[in-house]
Amino acid sequence: MTVKLDFEECLKDSPRFRASVELVEAEVSELETRLEKLLKLGNGLLESGRHYLAASRAFIVGICDLAHLGPPEPMMAECLDKFTQSLSHKLDSHAELLDATQHTLQRQIQTLVKEGLRSFREAGRDFWRGAESLEAALTHNAEVPRRRAQEAEEAGAALKVARAGYRGRALDYALQINVIEDKRKFDIMEFVLRLVEAQATHFQQGHEELSQLAQYRKELGGQLHQLVLNSAREKRDMEQRHVLLKQKELGGEEPEPSLKEGPGGLVMEGHLFKRASNAFKTWSRRWFTIQSNQLVYQKRYKDPVTVVVDDLRLCTVKLCPDSERRFCFEVVSPSKSCLLQSDSERLMQLWVSAVQSSIATAFSQARLDDSPRGLGQGSGHLAISSAATLGPGGLTRGREPGGVGHVAAQVQSVDGNAQCCDCREPAPEWASINLGVTLCIQCSGIHRSLGVHFSKVRSLTLDSWEPELVKLMCELGNVVINQIYEARVEAMAVKKPGPSCSRQEKEAWIHAKYVEKKFLTKLPEIRGRRGGRGPPRGHPPVPPKPGLIRPKPGSFRSKPEPPSEDLQSLHPGALLFRAAGHPPSLPTMADALAHGADVNWVNGGQENATPLIQATAAVRVLNSLLACEFLLQNGANVNQVDNQGRGPLHHATILGHTGLACLFLKRGADLGVRDSEGRDPLTIAVETANADIVTLLRLAKMREADAAQGQAGDETYLDIFRDFSLMASDDPEKLSRRSHDLHTL
């Protein structure tokens, strides 16, 4: 027995003893309160359990009634009978658990409250009455004068009696305190033990009951799986027949890529202020965590986490020096951006570094995966960036026509692409799709930190690739782009970093090359160049600068260079517009963008046409497709219209470019825009009798309607658009339904 109060201190009646008594009384009072609360909660639990049992039994009866609905089905009847019988046995076990819990509460807790604590309180009252009597006797004995001997003798005798009575009661009370302390421990632990034993018995019985159905459940699961497959197959066949009757032309199916999530651990956590995306732009403080290749936050510990970035490989982070608040940085993903604020400059830098490191780590882990993935966790979103979206709902699946190994081999086979564009490391497995270059993993992480407005990074081995994007990468390449961005490296005597250089050296080089653009061939001041009115629509593009771009003979990059005015007399926007014309010149377009051309530059001399509209009218469909893909990758607005109210989708429809129409629809082209004559793209397609484009536009409208109703839509939409994309890339002339007299529309 653990002695809480010492009997010697009890006889001394020291202040320490009195304080100990008061402390124990407070503890016992609190114990009594909590035990009464526990009893109340236990009674509530028992009452809820009985209600649960009653509701569960009624629920089982409802399940049994399903077996008698409609024609007899032996399989369903057997299933319901076995499972309801098992559930009934489990409820019987639950009732036994409630009875055991009630018995334990009454035996242990209620007995302790009513008997143990009651006797303790009575002993306490006797003790304090004795203490009061002793205090009174001591006071009276002390107040008797010397001259009153008789009274002093009586007071002394009374004091002895009071002291003896107090000490006896004090010893009894001390014993009672020590006993109640031990009894409390024993009774509570015994209560918990009996409760756990009852729970163990209950769950053991449930386990045994369900184990008897293990084999049956396994067999039933297999049968149900087969039924679901058959039903899904029948449903899909009916939907395909339905679309076939309406459209009469459908492409074949492609296997859906598998999804796999890579491992990840906790990187950093802490409080940050987050700006809301509503109209009020309010700021709230949340607990942010970088873990499992995700950026998440929560308000309280028990709150569910909110995912800001589902896959860090799809995002970039940048500082926000122009924000009204200090210490702000922004995490940008393809679908949204999140403005965050830390408490100090140092914390802001730490968070930015942590996000960048997490991005690099995510890519490194994916690179070490022995099993190449056609579409990983988040790479489906990467595919969306190339496959774009179809209306408000968007396309949700990408396609990889030739496999990841085929894409990497095809892109790396281009002259100069077998090495990293920036550090010359062999066998690069990453690419910047808006620049058209290949990168090593370290340089790709640096490119990603620049932001998507400078470089859009994608893996050659992990992500899905649309066919038009693969062809675009093969038409550009490291040699062409480096002739633009490194034009003055030799003249400036600047040393290019190698594979063994540090990350800091590579980062400084990449920043100077793509952000500061130190090595570009300088153009005259913009005000000295012409840019308000562009050349006629059919004028050939401006040829590349001598010595700046040297394309390979026989490729899309080496078009004939007809005589033209000096490039230096053109505004970069006008140069981009000219280069997007007949036929398009991707190197010249890249040169114009490098010199700051606005990808949505408007040519006032040609009905406010944009480079994207100009590229749509190229003579060769494949050239036009790749030029449009290049402009879209660099931020071209797919819905910007000319003076006649016609956007790129209108022009593609007028010219019968089915591949371009498919590309613009995937990139979110607005189907409802009408030109100055009140015609939308579908009206034009019907008037020109272009069945392919009519099919695409009607499917897109159906997709929009499904998305507006919250429906996922039929996978047939995706199949058709993937097939048109592949056909537009492999055999574009087959899809072209243009005729020369359509220009009069």
From Swiss-Prot:
Residues 405-745 are annotated as: Required for interaction with GULP1. The modification Phosphoserine is found at S555. Phosphorylation at Ser-555 by PKB is required for interaction with ITGB1, export of ITGB1 from recycling endosomes to the cell surface and ITGB1-dependent cell migration. The modification 3'-nitrotyrosine is found at Y485. The keyword Ligase does not apply. GAP activity stimulated by phosphatidylinositol 4,5-bisphosphate (PIP2) and phosphatidic acid. Residues 537-546 have a biased composition (Pro residues). GO terms for molecular function: GTPase activator activity; zinc ion binding. Residues 1-382 are annotated as: Required for formation of endosomal tubules when overexpressed with PIP5K1C. It is found in: Recycling endosome membrane. PROSITE patterns: ANK_REP_REGION, ANK_REPEAT, ARFGAP, PH_DOMAIN. Residues 525-567 are annotated as: Prevents interaction with ITGB1 when S-554 is not phosphorylated. It is a peripheral membrane protein. GO terms for cellular component: recycling endosome membrane. Residues 1-226 form the BAR domain. GO terms for biological process: signal transduction. Residues 525-569 are annotated as: Disordered. It holds the Pfam family Ank_2. Banana-shaped homodimer laterally assembling into tetramers, the tetramers further pack helically onto the membrane. Interacts with GTP-bound ARF6. Interacts with third cytoplasmic loop of SLC2A4/GLUT4. Interacts with CLTC. Interacts with GULP1. Forms a complex with GDP-bound ARF6 and GULP1. Interacts with ITGB1; required for ITGB1 recycling. This is Arf-GAP with coiled-coil, ANK repeat and PH domain-containing protein 1. It comes from Bos taurus (Bovine).
